[in-house]
Amino acid sequence: MNNNNSSKQVLVSILGVAILIVAVVGISFAAFSYSKTGTVANTITTGTITMSYSEPINGINLTDALPITDTAGKALTGANNTFDFTVSATVSGSTTINYVVTAVKGDGCTVADGGVKVYLTDQEDAQILAPTKVNALTKTVAGNAAGAPADQYVLKTGTYGTGAHTDNYRLRMWVADDYTAPATSQKYILKVNVYGQAVAK
C-alpha cells in the first residue's frame, strides 16, 4: 500500500512538473512570438548648417577709419576692411533648410548706423548685397523662417535642399562718404552670424 502511494506521489509529481513546464513554455512563447511588419516607412530627416572663418573674430572692427566713396569701399582688401567666411550645410533626407546671414553691432560702437556701409559678395566677387548703410538693412523678426533671433541685420537669406553645400562670402565695411566724423576716436564693430532651420513638413 505504501509502495502504491509512493508510486502515485511520484506520478503526480512528474505530471505536475510536466504541466508546469508546458505552462511556462506556452506563456514564454505567447509573450515573445508576437511580431508585426510595419506598414509605414520610417524616414529620418536631418540638416546642419555651419559658418566658419579664419579671422580672430566673426566680423569687422573699424577704428578711426576715414569716410570713403562706394567705389573705394567696394575695392577694399585686408584686415579690418573685409571679413571672409564660409557657410556650409549638409542636408539629408527630404529636408529643406531656410537660412539667413545676419549682422549685429558689437559693444562700444561710437559711429552711428547711418554712418557705416556694408557690401557683400560671393567667392567670385559678384555682388550679393549692394553698398548699403547699416540702418537701411532689413531686420529679422521673431519667428522668422530661419530661426534667427529678432532685431539682427539681414545680409542674405536663402534655402538649401538635399546635398552638401558650401558658399564663400566676403563682407566689406567702410565709413560712408556723407558721414561727418567728430574729432574724437571713432569705432564700429559688426559681427556676422548664420542661422538655419528645417522647413516644417
Q: Which stretches of residues belong to each language-model region?
A:
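Short, polar/proline-rich extracytoplasmic segments that appear immediately after membrane translocation
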Residues: N2-K74, Q186-Y188, Y195-K201
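Extracellular adhesion/glycan-binding regions together with long Ser/Thr-
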Residues: N2-N4, A65-T77, Q127-N168, R172-M173
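Intrinsically disordered, low-complexity, compositionally biased regions/tails
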Residues: L20, M51, T63, T77, ...
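Compositionally biased, low-complexity repeat tracts
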Residues: V22, T43, E55, T69, ...
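Surface-exposed interaction patch
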Residues: S33, K74-L137
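Intrinsic-disorder/low-complexity loop/linker signature
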Residues: T48, G59, G73, G93-S94, ...
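Generic preference for hydrophobic/aromatic residues in regular secondary structure cores
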Residues: T50-E55, V87-A89, V118-L120, L171-M173
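C-terminal, structured domain-capping segment
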Residues: N81-K105, P149-K201
